[in-house]
Amino acid sequence: MHMNFNNKSEILKRANFLLKDGIKNRDSLFHTPIISSLNGNEISSRVMVLRDHIASKRVIRFHSDYRSDKVHELKANKKISVIGYDPNLKTQIRLTGKAKINHKNKSSKKAWEESQAISKKCYSVKDGSSTKTNKPELYDFHMKDISVEDGYKNFCTIEIYYDTLEFLYLQRQGHRRCKFKWNAKGKLQSFWLVP
């Protein structure tokens, strides 16, 4: 795909395309970006699977166990950062914004119903993510006593409403870095940054 990396509107379209593609394309490195939140004064990062992107609302969605550390962190501080990089495309996308946790509501129910059974099993285990254990085999998915639908009570979605999107493209003749920033009313400002 040939595009003009000197055109900010084309860059924003490209970023939206790569994020949308990352939802279903498991080979895309934007399918599994790094999500960072704050745990007190410490940065806490993890790789998560991108489940949805709605460019018009500037929202991306991930799934999580409601009992996890990241959910507790985001309840205490909604600030969040997302970064993905694909070395083949020489492209980095970074988002910053605020997280919203959906648990036992219409949004989480819809996402749960659209999830595959293998994904649901992750939320059906006895203890939440990051719980210490001496017997990891107790959490293997081949267990016969897991009731998959019981996992819904532990399932939540994390929606990230981003107010900045930064796009970096690496090229031999000169890199391009552009930042898009939306104010509280949704008005877009964009500017070039030195890479």
Which functions belong to the PLM regions below?
Residues 37-40, 84-88, 169-171, 182-184:
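Short acidic, glycine-rich loop/turn motifs
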